[in-house]
Curated annotation (Swiss-Prot):
Function: May play a role in cell growth and maintenance of cell morphology.
Keywords: Endoplasmic reticulum, Membrane, Transmembrane, Transmembrane helix
Protein family per UniProt: Belongs to the TRIQK family.
Keyword Membrane: yes
GO CC entries: endoplasmic reticulum membrane
Protein's UniProt keywords contain Transmembrane: yes
Segments passing through the bilayer: 51-71
UniProt xrefs under InterPro entries: TRIQK
UniProt name for this protein: Triple QxxK/R motif-containing protein
PANTHER family (UniProt xref): TRIPLE QXXK/R MOTIF-CONTAINING PROTEIN, TRIPLE QXXK_R MOTIF-CONTAINING PROTEIN
Subcellular location: Endoplasmic reticulum membrane
Topology relative to the membrane: Single-pass membrane protein
Length: 86
């Protein structure tokens, strides 16, 4: 019986360490949460490079369409035909 009772009693040093650990965890919990949120926001944020690449691709596409229609719709004037001949 003596052994069973002795095992359940914790040393005051162990109780003190446990209490200090709980207090430390309570102090660092908001800091850890803020750090996690900051890392997640940084991970999911769109960078300037990606935005620049998308804008450059759209601009290149628009210029290609413009060049295609400009070259397609311009009429070639033959120098052999004189329009002033009536």
């Amino acid at each position: 019986m003596g052994r069973k009772d002795a095992a359940t009693i914790k040393l005051p040093v162990d109780q003190y360490r446990k209490q200090i650990g709980k207090q430390d965890y309570k102090k660092t919990k908001p800091i850890l949460r803020a750090t996690k949120l900051k890392a997640e926001a940084k991970k999911t944020a769109i960078g300037i490079k990606e935005v620049g690449l998308v804008l450059a691709a759209i601009l290149a596409l628009l210029l290609a369409f413009y060049a295609f229609f400009y070259l397609r719709l311009t009429t070639d004037v033959d120098p052999d035909l004189d329009q002033d001949e009536d």
